[in-house]
Amino acid sequence: AAASDNFMRF
C-alpha cells in the first residue's frame, strides 16, 4: 500500500 509506505517514510 502506497499510503502505508509513505507514512513509514516520515
Curated annotation (Swiss-Prot):
Entry comment describing in which tissues the protein is expressed: Detected in the thoracic perisympathetic organs in larvae, and the dorsal ganglionic sheath in adults (at protein level).
Residue spans crossing the bilayer: none
Protein name: FMRFamide-6
Compartments in which it is found: Secreted
Positions of post-translational Phenylalanine amide modification: F10
Keyword Secreted (UniProt): yes
GO BP field: neuropeptide signaling pathway
